[in-house]
């Protein structure tokens, strides 16, 4: 039965309900307060559940060497992979299991893959995501594709890394629904095989820190997508792109290969895409107001976006209604689009840009009418579709056999791919 809920705004660690700050009781509990039904002697302190000093003698793991697909830069230990979380084989495998394991949610119905399914462009292809108890969020599920190269996470960039991002959904009341991280860790600690893997990978028991690092490792590697038709063309396979895709590429803002003799009669960068969608991953990792979600009648943004992630007292008016530039790689797979999922197709996305966005006080200054013809708009869409990776991993390839509980029960990872209530 669905819970009766009030409208709430989520901020990690607290709920804003009716304008009041509500701190869940479990978060207020002291380190010495026992879990309900347990004695103080049997209880592990919250600190030990979140982080534990490793015992190096237990670690039995190997480095994981990854060669990214064609068109993507190396996973540099300096710029992409944190020194505190090097890639290892055991960590990747552990992260793969945790990613698809619904036991990370309060009622065992939601896994990371519920909202970030590899076969759906690492999203859920829904306007906004559905979590525990069929509760619906307010934002579109952002893709995990190539987040290895990301400088910040979430639409508003409120988390600086995949490691910190992985911890948020666990305690989001409309996603995985856990009141605190301690309960998640305790639940995973009840799985014998996880305890064994954590000892080998980290030299610790199951901890939140280890869970986050394993999940981040899996996402960095498994969600890499390159070797698209564009990458093949860029590498010298001139016939990899059609004439329409080549015209779209030029309109997008990219020059043709120097050995290509095709001469498209279109204006370079007329669509202005490369003002934001730049680099190997086609994103500037910055925040822009496109007018999506502006309520003209109320003269306000339905979602304040980046501004909400900035510290109170340090909020920039220019950040109001601004959201992070997503990658265009695999965009053909990850619709609907924009932070609220309001644009169903890439054609609708082009229509929005072509008209110059939606006027509002914080509209990005580069958002102006493009005056693209229908053919030009179609060509840009064709090019974006040509950015679909051909080496991406499918859900079936990645779906693991999950370890059983103490009583031998094995959760259904495939069932958790379907959002609750659908």
Predicted regions and their residues:
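Short amphipathic alpha-helical segments with coiled-coil-like heptad repeat character
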Residues: 2-3, 205-210, 260
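N-terminal Sec-pathway targeting helices
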Residues: 2-14
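Hydrophobic membrane-insertion alpha-helices, especially the h-region
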Residues: 12-22
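Signal peptide processing junction and immediate N-terminal pro/mature segment
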Residues: 22-36
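Short glycine/threonine-rich turn/loop motifs
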Residues: 34-168, 228-344, 348-354, 358-361, ...
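Generic hydrophobic/packing signal
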Residues: 148-151, 166-170, 188, 192, ...
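A gly/proline- and charged-residue-enriched helix-loop-helix capping module
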Residues: 173-178, 187
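C-terminal capping alpha-helices of c-type cytochrome domains
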Residues: 181-225, 332, 342-422
């Amino acid at each position: 039965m669905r819970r009766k809920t009030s409208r709430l705004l989520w901020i990690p660690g607290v709920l804003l309900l009716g304008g009041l700050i509500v701190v869940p009781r479990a978060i207020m509990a002291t380190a010495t307060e026992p879990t309900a039904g347990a004695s103080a002697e049997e209880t592990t302190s919250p600190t030990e559940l979140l982080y534990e000093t490793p015992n190096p003698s237990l670690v039995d793991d190997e480095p994981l060497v990854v060669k990214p697909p064609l068109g993507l830069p190396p996973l540099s230990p300096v710029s992409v992979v944190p020194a505190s979380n090097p890639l290892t084989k055991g960590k990747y495998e552990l992260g793969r299991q945790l990613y698809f394991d619904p036991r990370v949610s309060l009622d065992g119905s939601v896994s990371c893959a519920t909202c970030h399914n590899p076969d759906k462009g690492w999203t859920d292809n829904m306007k906004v995501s559905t979590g525990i108890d069929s509760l619906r969020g307010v934002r579109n599920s952002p893709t995990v594709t190539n987040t290895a190269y990301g400088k910040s996470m979430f639409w508003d960039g409120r988390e600086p890394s995949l490691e910190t991002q992985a911890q948020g959904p666990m305690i989001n009341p409309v996603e995985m629904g856990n009141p605190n991280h301690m309960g998640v860790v305790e639940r995973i600690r009840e799985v014998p095989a996880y305890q064994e893997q954590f000892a080998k990978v980290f030299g610790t028991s199951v901890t939140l820190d280890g869970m986050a690092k394993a999940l981040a490792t899996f996402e960095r590697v498994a969600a890499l997508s390159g070797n698209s038709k564009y990458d093949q063309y860029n590498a010298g396979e001139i016939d990899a792109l059609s004439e329409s895709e080549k015209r779209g590429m030029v309109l997008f803002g990219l020059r043709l290969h120097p050995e290509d003799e095709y001469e498209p009669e279109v204006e370079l960068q007329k669509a202005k895409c490369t003002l934001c969608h730049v680099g190997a991953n086609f994103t500037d990792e910055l925040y822009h107001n496109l007018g999506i979600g502006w309520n003209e009648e109320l003269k306000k943004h339905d979602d304040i976006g980046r501004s909400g992630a900035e510290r109170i007292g340090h909020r920039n008016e220019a950040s109001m209604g601004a959201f992070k530039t997503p990658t265009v790689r695999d965009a053909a797979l990850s619709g609907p689009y924009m932070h609220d999922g309001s644009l169903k197709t890439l054609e609708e996305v082009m229509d929005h840009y072509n008209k110059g966005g939606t006027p509002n006080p914080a509209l990005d200054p580069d958002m102006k009418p493009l005056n693209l013809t229908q053919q030009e708009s179609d060509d840009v869409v064709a090019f974006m579709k040509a950015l679909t990776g051909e080496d991406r991993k499918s859900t079936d390839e990645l779906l693991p056999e999950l370890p059983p509980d103490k009583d031998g029960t094995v959760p259904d990872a495939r069932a958790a791919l379907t959002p609750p209530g659908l």
